[in-house]
């Protein structure tokens, strides 16, 4: 008997220790909704294959906020592929064309910016005027919505310009998407023949170069992991992020997280999104 017990003890000693595993992703989302007193819409999808890995309120509408800028630049790149646009085309504008939060475009009133530079500013710095300057080429909000319909997204819609599109009124369908629709659209833009391989690489690189997302998913990303993302922020507690991430510096999954109708501060919203992402990553690694 003593020998048997020693064998069991020796066997247990060789097993890996389970260290205080965090909550499962859906448990974390429920906790976040409780702490935020608001709603979370979320989906996790494989980038290469159809199917949903994790979802919560994935078919409910949430304000898009600045996450629409990825789709906007995707539509612009589709025009480049078709020969109707050039990333090198210079756009000139006046001070009265600027809206709130234009950290890049406000510095180029004298010389203007190219389409490529405006997309970089819109995605990497979330420059609002850059987005507005790009919208006319795709037909404005209605034209961008038409582009979405053409690529099979029958849900996502843009109705207004920056900065009015961030109003996020409860129950207002304007300027909204669902986590599922946004994730599917991202997959189409980055993996299907909707864009050329060159344009796909460019769109992804702009997202890799995002400089205003450090307090969200990037704050919990393990060393050596890949991430490309775009954030959004709006009124009435609206906050969101669309991202591609994966281990070994490879994009493997799409993660979309939206918040709405919460009195939480921006710091609290960022923390909750980071917490949800952290739970997803931990579950992924198990």
From Swiss-Prot:
Belongs to the class-A beta-lactamase family. Residues 1-21 form the signal peptide. The keyword Ribonucleoprotein does not apply. It catalyses: a beta-lactam + H2O = a substituted beta-amino acid. The active site is at residues 66, 164. Transmembrane segments: none annotated. It comes from Enterobacter cloacae. It holds the Pfam family Beta-lactamase2. It is an enzyme of class 3 (hydrolase). InterPro entries: Beta-lactam/transpept-like, Beta-lactam_cat, Beta-lactam_class-A, Beta-lactam_class-A_AS. Its EC number is 3.5.2.6. GO terms for biological process: beta-lactam antibiotic catabolic process; response to antibiotic. GO terms for molecular function: beta-lactamase activity. Keywords: Antibiotic resistance, Disulfide bond, Hydrolase, Plasmid, Signal. This is Beta-lactamase Ohio-1. NCBIfam families: bla_class_A, SHV_LEN_OKP. The class A beta-lactamase family has a specific amino-acid numbering system, sometimes called Ambler or ABL numbering and often misspelt as Amber. A multiple sequence alignment was used to derive a consensus sequence and then the consensus was numbered taking into account insertions and deletions. This allows use of identical numbers, e.g. for active site residues, despite differences in protein length. UniProt always uses natural numbering of residues, hence there appear to be differences in numbering between this entry and some papers. Disulfide bonds join 73-119.
């Amino acid at each position: 008997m003593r020998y048997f017990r020693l064998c069991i003890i020796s066997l247990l000693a060789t097993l890996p220790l389970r260290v205080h595993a965090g909550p499962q992703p859906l448990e974390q989302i429920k906790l976040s909704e409780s702490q935020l007193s608001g709603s979370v819409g979320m989906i996790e999808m494989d980038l290469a294959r159809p199917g949903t890995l994790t979802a919560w309120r994935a078919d409910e509408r949430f304000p898009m906020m600045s996450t629409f800028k990825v789709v906007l630049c995707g539509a612009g790149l589709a025009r480049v592929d078709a020969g109707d646009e050039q990333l090198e085309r210079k756009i000139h504008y006046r001070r009265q064309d600027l809206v709130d939060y234009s950290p890049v475009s406000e510095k180029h009133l004298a010389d203007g910016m190219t389409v490529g530079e405006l997309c970089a500013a819109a995605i990497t710095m979330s420059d609002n005027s850059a987005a507005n300057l790009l919208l006319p080429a795709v037909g404005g909000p209605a034209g961008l919505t038409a582009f979405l319909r053409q690529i099979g997204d029958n849900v996502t819609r843009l109705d207004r310009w920056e900065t009015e599109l961030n109003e996020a009124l409860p129950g207002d369908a304007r300027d909204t998407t669902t986590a599922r629709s946004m994730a599917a659209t991202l997959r189409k833009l980055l993996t299907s023949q909707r864009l050329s391989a060159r344009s796909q690489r460019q769109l992804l690189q702009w997202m890799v170069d995002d400089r205003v997302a450090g307090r969200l998913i990037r704050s919990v990303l393990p060393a050596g992991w890949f991430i490309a993302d775009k954030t959004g922020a709006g009124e009435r507690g609206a906050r969101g992020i669309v991202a591609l991430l994966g281990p070994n510096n490879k994009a493997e999954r799409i993660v979309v997280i939206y918040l709405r109708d919460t009195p939480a501060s921006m710091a609290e919203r960022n923390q909750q999104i980071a917490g949800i992402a952290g739970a997803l990553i931990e579950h992924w690694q198990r």
